């Protein structure tokens, strides 16, 4: 049962991160199209935000290992 729970958690976090990254990139392109002079600042903020979005699957992987080893 723990394996199923870990698999569901991993799938959910991967789907959520994929959707989040897609929305983030769409808004970045939209923002650069509006104000091209802010491209450097927007790209920096995008990388920081993408790191925060990608942190969730990494945390879930660690939690899944704990769940499987119980």
UniProtKB/Swiss-Prot annotation:
Site residues, Reversibly protonated during proton transport: 54
Localization (cell): Cell membrane
Keywords per UniProt: ATP synthesis, Cell membrane, CF(0), Hydrogen ion transport, Ion transport, Lipid-binding, Membrane, Transmembrane, Transmembrane helix, Transport
Keyword match Chaperone: no
Pfam families, alphabetized: ATP-synt_C
GO cellular component: plasma membrane; proton-transporting ATP synthase complex; proton-transporting two-sector ATPase complex, proton-transporting domain
Main location: membrane
Bilayer topology: Multi-pass membrane protein
Record carries keyword DNA-binding: no
Database matches in InterPro entries: ATP_synth_csu_bac/chlpt, ATP_synth_F0_csu, ATP_synth_F0_csu_DDCD_BS, ATP_synth_F0_csu_sf, ATPase_proteolipid_c-like_dom, F/V-ATP_Csub_sf
S-S bonds: none
Molecular function GO terms recorded: lipid binding; proton-transporting ATP synthase activity, rotational mechanism
Transmembrane region(s): 4-24, 48-68
Protein family: Belongs to the ATPase C chain family.
Subunit details: F-type ATPases have 2 components, F(1) - the catalytic core - and F(0) - the membrane proton channel. F(1) has five subunits: alpha(3), beta(3), gamma(1), delta(1), epsilon(1). F(0) has three main subunits: a(1), b(2) and c(10-14). The alpha and beta chains form an alternating ring which encloses part of the gamma chain. F(1) is attached to F(0) by a central stalk formed by the gamma and epsilon chains, while a peripheral stalk is formed by the delta and b chains.
Role according to the record: F(1)F(0) ATP synthase produces ATP from ADP in the presence of a proton or sodium gradient. F-type ATPases consist of two structural domains, F(1) containing the extramembraneous catalytic core and F(0) containing the membrane proton channel, linked together by a central stalk and a peripheral stalk. During catalysis, ATP synthesis in the catalytic domain of F(1) is coupled via a rotary mechanism of the central stalk subunits to proton translocation. Key component of the F(0) channel; it plays a direct role in translocation across the membrane. A homomeric c-ring of between 10-14 subunits forms the central stalk rotor element with the F(1) delta and epsilon subunits.
Protein name per Swiss-Prot or TrEMBL: ATP synthase subunit c
Organism: Oenococcus oeni (strain ATCC BAA-331 / PSU-1)
Lineage: Bacteria, Bacillati, Bacillota, Bacilli, Lactobacillales
């Amino acid at each position: 049962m723990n394996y199923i729970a870990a698999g569901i958690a991993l799938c959910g976090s991967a789907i959520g991160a994929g959707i989040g990254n897609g929305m983030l990139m769409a808004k970045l392109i939209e923002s650069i199209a509006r104000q091209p002079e802010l491209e450097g600042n927007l790209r920096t903020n995008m990388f920081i935000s993408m790191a925060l979005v990608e942190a969730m699957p990494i945390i879930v992987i660690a939690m899944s290992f704990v769940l499987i080893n119980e």
